[in-house]
């Protein structure tokens, strides 16, 4: 799977706080989010349906699945490089509800 960092919808306030605190938004608690893996031929219709709903206004296609069954989840960074999206090491930050 190859993700595009620039395509991941992160609120500017969240991005600023993460940058200030040295955190990666992918590894902090986040509620009310959905990652859907759909067939390529259905992607446009699924995205359009999500965007049509008030709660899906920030829906986005953030990547694609590779045909290589041994491929790691990777991300193309904002600078054009690639990095492996690894499991979180250690304990996640607690949710504040």
Predicted regions span which residues?
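Acidic, Ser/Thr/Pro-rich beta/coil linker or hinge segments at domain junctions
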Residues: 53-97
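Helix N-cap motif at beta-to-alpha junctions
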Residues: 38-44
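Short amphipathic alpha-helices in soluble, non-transmembrane regions
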Residues: 45-55
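Active-site-proximal betaalpha loop/short-helix elements
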Residues: 1-30
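Short beta-strand-to-turn element immediately C-terminal to the catalytic PLP-Schiff-base lysine
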Residues: 36-38, 75-76
């Amino acid at each position: 799977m190859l993700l595009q960092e620039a395509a991941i919808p992160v609120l500017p306030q969240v991005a600023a706080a993460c940058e200030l605190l040295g955190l990666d938004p992918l590894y902090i608690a986040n509620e009310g989010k959905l990652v859907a893996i759909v067939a390529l031929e259905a992607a446009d219709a699924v995205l359009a349906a999500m965007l049509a709903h008030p709660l899906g206004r920030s829906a986005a296609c953030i990547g694609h699945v590779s045909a290589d069954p041994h491929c790691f989840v990777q991300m193309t960074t904002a600078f054009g490089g690639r990095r492996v999206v690894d499991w979180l090491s250690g304990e996640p930050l607690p949710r504040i509800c």
